[in-house]
Amino acid sequence: MKVLVLGAGVIGTTTAWFLREQGHDVTVVERHSAAALETSFANGGQISVSHVEPWANPQAPFQILKWLGQADAPLLFRPRLDLQQWRWGLQFLIECLPSRNRRNMLQILAISKYSGEVLRNLRAATGLHYDDLQRGILQIYTDREGFDAAAAAAELVRQYGIAREVKTAAECIAIEPSLKNRQDWIAGGTYTASDETGDAKKFTQSLAALAIERGVVFRYGMTVESLSVAGNAVSGVHTVDEQHGRELLDADAYVVCLSSYTPKLLAPIGVSALVYPAKGYSATLGIVDPAAAPTVSITDDAKKMVFTRLGDRLRVAGTAELSGYGLELNPVRCEALTRRANEWFGDAVDTKHPEYWTGLRPATPSNVPLIGRTRYPNLYLNTGHGTLGWTMSCGSGKAVADLVSGRKPEVDFAFLDG
């Protein structure tokens, strides 16, 4: 079949790769000049199968209230005259119910675990390198309440085959010695040796280059404007670019991987996708003392930040701001990243020359992504992965390719079906 994939972030590029593997004629449409120049550009770098706790949990409403008015709060809700934002917020509160929280966690775990397996197979088959490390992820807790809740979550994922181990402060230091200067901060941690890290941008651009060698066409610099519908099927994609002007592209099947912009494309044809942008920040810092810098990726639960080594750089990322589609850098939130990096690893990194970045992560209220077929039989979605797009990318891409090909995906997940 002829398939159009809309978007060349890590989700769209992996989708295109697996569609091509299954024999389809694939074209990817991307508004930027290369793959991975938007949401996948400078994320936290974690491939975190074990960290599946949704933002929407029974404690979340109280935490958000506590953080109101704090410019550097880990999760910041800025109310707007935006119906989509309020619909999202109300559904988020519903997803905080204990029964829904557990169901969502199991869905996230299923697709994340599967995706980790697919990524390992893909790396073995292609030999891709992307500043990847297989050293695990260590989640640090600075208060007893958070540590106790993490221990319960770790027990749940262990029941499903993920070896997330509860660690004392001393054991955390043994796993990652660069934490030793702040041992008195640490109440405990959880560690998953099977989790990985890597540069999502490098991975995506390398995979796109391989996909081109295998026949996938990437139409860069081309913006998707709208979808055409004929009867009960999508009949084309209206695009525009500087070179060709306006163009109508047609295919047998269409896969929308447009991150936070997915709802804007779908609403005119009557397809609802409750996805809202969660603005995240990162700072990339040069490593000045490699021996003092972490090699195990660290998640600081109190500040909702991650620290990931990517070659000779340390990526610090985190926070979520529900404030619309603006990409302006907030100095307070940027400085919070470098301040925390300095507190943990000040001797190891250059915090005076950070490279700041912000991107819009496509969040659903449940944190469960939207993967599968819409009410139009030839229109598929692969979006809504929130902070776990890198983690879920390979599994999501392969699953969508299976669905387009009429195959049953190899993972037990609640795929969309009309």
Segments predicted by a language model, with ranges:
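N-terminal Rossmann-like FAD-binding beta1-loop-alpha1 element of flavoenzymes
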Residues: 2-28
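Active-site substrate-recognition segment that forms the wall
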Residues: 43-46, 51, 55-95, 180, ...
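C-terminal lid/capping helical subdomain adjacent to the catalytic/cofactor pocket in oxidative enzymes
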Residues: 166, 179, 200, 229-231, ...
